[in-house]
């Protein structure tokens, strides 16, 4: 191989760049003053499990009373106008409706688990209703 001529390069001093790099690194690692603290977040699923335990312990109604009452009146208008309801009748309808929905979701969850899934899907609800004999 042929030798090449090396040209002289201007030196910048050996220690100056190192000192500059050290100050940059120190500036980056130092905590930012007045920084906004990130809000605490639970891991995915933790809050869901907590809510499941909470609602399984409780006995209160889960659907708000007035929206449910409006829904009952709207459905009843299709059959007969000017129907009147006792408050105890609306409460009985709400208790029965919520009990039905809770059982349906329990069966739906079992259908999803049977399919080796943890997420319920419309096909699970359809299967649960079909097994119950509600829908042919």
Swiss-Prot record:
- The keyword Phosphoprotein appears for this protein: yes
Q: Which CDD domains match?
A: HFD_H3
Post-translationally, this protein is described as follows, namely:
Acetylation is generally linked to gene activation. Methylation at Lys-5 is linked to gene activation. Methylation at Lys-10 is linked to gene repression.
Record's GO cellular component terms: nucleosome; nucleus
Q: Where is this region: Disordered?
A: 1-43
Q: Does DNA-binding appear among the keywords?
A: yes
Q: Which UniProt keywords apply?
A: Acetylation, Chromosome, DNA-binding, Methylation, Nucleosome core, Nucleus, Phosphoprotein
Disulfide bond entries: none
User: Which InterPro entries does the entry mention?
Assistant: Histone-fold, Histone_H2A/H2B/H3, Histone_H3/CENP-A
| Location, primary (coarse class) | nucleus
User: Could you tell me the superkingdom of the organism this chain comes from?
Assistant: Eukaryota
**What Pfam families does the record tag this protein with?**
Histone (PF00125)
**One term of GO molecular function:** protein heterodimerization activity
Which residues are modified to N6-acetyllysine? 10, 15, 24
PTM sites of type N6-methylated lysine: 5, 10, 28, 37, 80
Q: Which SUPFAM superfamilies match?
A: Histone-fold
Q: How does it assemble?
A: The nucleosome is a histone octamer containing two molecules each of H2A, H2B, H3 and H4 assembled in one H3-H4 heterotetramer and two H2A-H2B heterodimers. The octamer wraps approximately 147 bp of DNA.
Family under the similarity heading: Belongs to the histone H3 family.
Q: What is this protein called?
A: Histone H3, embryonic
- Origin species, per record, is Strongylocentrotus purpuratus
